[in-house]
Every structure is written in C-alpha cells, then in structure tokens.
Amino acid sequence: MTDNFTCNKTDGDNTDFRYFIYAVTYTVILVPGLIGNILALWVFYGYMKETKRAVVFMINLAIADLLQILSLPLRIFYYLNHDWPFGPGLCMFCFYLKYVNMYASIYFLVCISVRRFWFLMYPFRFNDCKQKYDLYISIIGWLIICLACLLFPLLRTNDDTPGNRTKCFVDLPIRNVNLAQSVAMITIGEVVGFVTPLMIVLYCTWKTALSLQNKYPISQHLGEKKKALKMILTCAGVFLVCFVPYHFSFPLDFLVKSNEIKSCFARRVILIFHSVALCLASLNSCLDPVIYYFTTNEFRRRLSRQDLPDNIQLHTKSYKIASNHATSTVAAELC
C-alpha cells in the first residue's frame, strides 16, 4: 500500500513537468506548422499537373499534418489549465487525430520514398504511371489508418475524476485489458505501423545510395539520383527523429499505465522519456514543410515566385507581338 502511494506521488510529481513540455512544444509547432503546411498545399496544387514525382503523397502528408495542427490549440489549453471543459466527445476526437496524423505521416513518408526510388531505378517502367494510381493508394491508406487508429480511443476511458477535474489526452485512463491481449495488440501495431515502414525507408535509402556508385553514370542521371537520395534521406531522417523514440517508449508507457511496472524509479524515467518522445513525434508536422522546401526544386521555385518574372516576360512578349500585328494590319488597310 505504501509503495503504491509512493509511486502515485512520484507520478504526480512528474505531471507539472510533463504538462510544461507539452504546452511549450505545441506552442512552438502551431504557427510554423500551420503556415508551412498551408503554403505546401498551395504550392503542390499549383504544379500538380507539371510533375509525376509523388506530389499526391505530399499533398496527403500536408493534410495529415494540418489535422493535428488544428487540434493543438485545444491541447495547449488543456496542458495550461489542467482541465478539459469541452466534453468527452471532442476529447476523444482530438486524441484520435493525434494517432491518425502519426500513422498517416508514416504511411505517406514511405509512399514518397518508394515513389522516388521506383521512378529513379525503373524510369521507363514507371514513367507513364498516372497520378490517379497515387490517388487510389492514398484513399486506401486513409481508410486503413482511420479504421486501425480507432483502437487508441477505444482502449481509453474518459470518466470524470474527483475534484471537478476532467482528464484528457495523456491522462486518459486505460481500460482493463488482459495483459496477453495487450502485448499482442502492441506487437502487431509496432510491426505493421513502425518496423515494416522503417525497413522499407531504409531499404530505399540503401539502394539509392548504392546506385550512385555506378562507374559510368550519365551526368543527368547522376543529378536525378542525388536529388532522389536527398529526398529519401530526409524522409528517413524525419522518420528516425520523430517516430523511433515514440515507438520505443509507447509499449513501456502502456505497461506503466497498466500498473505492470512497479518500480517507482522505472516509472518516473519511462514517463519522462515518453513525454519527450511524444513531443518529438509531434514535430513531424513542422518538419515536413522543411522537407518540401529543401528537397523539391518546384517547391522553392514557386514559393520564391521565381517563375513570376518569366510569366510577366511571356505576357509582355505576347502583348508586343499582338500589338505589332495589329499595327501592321491597320497600316496595310490604310495603304
């Protein structure tokens, strides 16, 4: 009894620290993530018909990021006020969006990596690949992710707690589930939602890097390979920074909240580690627009409006040609 009381007190001592980390992280992410992803959607829509290079997947990735960003003000409110006055339905929906964003981001980062890899390694086979196929892949991915992520809110309960304080997000209690079933669900989720996508991204990175070692590369192909490797490496970097720590800490956090881990010191370390990992997982909404800017020439060109002077010159030349033609016609008629 005393040990349980001591551990509960230790967990409670971590609460203010964890709330502070969450509030600061989400505040930092909110404005840059919102502006960056809205700009990304505008840019991608503008040159969607000009390229076949994974633009559909990038659009879906930006949409996934916006889903999480739009819920951040409510998360910030909760972690600053330590209370949720907006009802259990909205709490569960925002909680659900977090996981939809995470696994949609993982899915579309994999799609972008595979698309660039295939387009580079098998250009003739995939050169005529239409964007509608990417659209079908995106729709199927959204359906699977949205259905699979329903497990996260279903495994939580939002019963009110004493003291007129309503819990939400990381404080939602876990329902009583058999340990064997819990381990099975976590294992399947980790393998399907994290390990397999990570292996695919690392494989694409490895094979693309090997292709640069060709002794007689054509300069144009070498440039394309370097661009593709840059894109795939950036996707792998975001994957490793944002999602690896979370998927290491998630099973441990689940065991803590299920009271399977009894050591007070271990509980304290795991709760802090999971809080940091959760913040890193949220950073992907802010980092994805950086991927677009530094790895996509069309994105930089349109965002910097470098194509604007060309358009102005084109319209000016057209106007001059039309004016000269009209002048010549009038002169001929007068003669």
UniProtKB/Swiss-Prot annotation:
Q: What are the annotated GO cellular component locations? A: centriolar satellite; intracellular membrane-bounded organelle; plasma membrane
Please give the residues the UniProt entry marks as glycosylated.
N4, N8, N164
Q: How does it sit in the membrane?
A: Multi-pass membrane protein
MF terms in GO:
bioactive lipid receptor activity
A biological process from GO: T cell homeostasis
Tell me the tissue specificity.
Answer: Expressed in spleen and, at low levels, in brain. Highly expressed in developing and mature regulatory T-cells.
Transmembrane annotation, as ranges: 28-48, 54-74, 92-112, 135-155, 183-203, 232-252, 269-289
Disulfide bridges in this chain:
C91-C168
Subcellular location, record wording: Cell membrane
What keywords would UniProt list here?
Answer: Cell membrane, Disulfide bond, G-protein coupled receptor, Glycoprotein, Membrane, Receptor, Transducer, Transmembrane, Transmembrane helix
Q: Pfam families from the entry?
A: 7tm_1
| Topological domain spans for side Extracellular | 1-27, 75-91, 156-182, 253-268
Q: Which residues form the signal peptide?
A: none
Describe the outcome of a gene knockout: GPR174 deficiency appears to favor regulatory T-cells cell accumulation in specific tissues. Knock-out mice are resistant to inflammatory shock induced by lipopolysaccharide (LPS) and cecal ligation and puncture (CLP). GPR174-deficient B-cells have a defect in CD86 up-regulation.
Which residue spans belong to the Cytoplasmic compartment? 49-53, 113-134, 204-231, 290-335
User: What interactions and quaternary structure are annotated?
Assistant: Interacts with GNA13. Interacts with CCL21.
Q: What does this protein do?
A: G-protein-coupled receptor of lysophosphatidylserine (LysoPS) that plays different roles in immune response. Plays a negative role in regulatory T-cell accumulation and homeostasis. Under inflammatory conditions where LysoPS production increases, contributes to the down-regulation of regulatory T-cell activity to favor effector response. Mediates the suppression of IL-2 production in activated T-lymphocytes leading to inhibition of growth, proliferation and differentiation of T-cells.
Q: Which family does it belong to?
A: Belongs to the G-protein coupled receptor 1 family.
Q: Which PANTHER family match?
A: G-PROTEIN COUPLED RECEPTOR, G-PROTEIN COUPLED RECEPTOR 174-RELATED
Report the protein name in the record. Answer: Probable G-protein coupled receptor 174
Organism expressing this protein natively: Mus musculus
